Amino acid sequence: MTAAPLLVAYEIDERRRAVVAEVLQGAAEVVYLTDLGEAERAAALRGAGVVLASNTSKDLRPGEAALLAETRLLQFMVAGVDFIPLGDLPPGLPVAVNGGAYAEPMAEHALALVLAAAKRLFIEHRKLETGEFNQFTPNRMLAGMVACILGLGGVGVETARLMRCLG
């Protein structure tokens, strides 16, 4: 008996397909849903062992989620699935997410926005565009301040870690 294939439900480019092939080293057949016609799609969805998806509301057509009843795992490649209509999926289908995968870059972005706000970056930049150079309006110093992090998931924890360097 052969293993059920890995089904990639979203569009990926040739470079990423090469990465998938290299990582799997032939351990599983890989089927790309975006390469298939209507009848082939239904058969591939019914027979998939594991499905990699980005957003099933976009990756799958209406009614296709029900075809995943025999799938052993639906792995989302995104960190959060708040926007995914999980109720459309077959009951009992194990779902995994990529939580925390983007924690470091998101935390750095949060820190950059905090610094930009504290230093009035956007306000002063707009003034510079009109020829006004304002060097006298004080901006906030962040050293010793307290940051309030709402949510301590992967992004929140990493943001708190970065903010700690400010005091």
What positions do the PLM features span?
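Short loop/helix-cap segments at secondary-structure boundaries that form the rim of catalytic
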Residues: 18-23, 42-45, 64-66, 83-91, ...
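Rossmann-like dinucleotide/phosphate-binding beta-alpha-beta segment
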Residues: 136-167
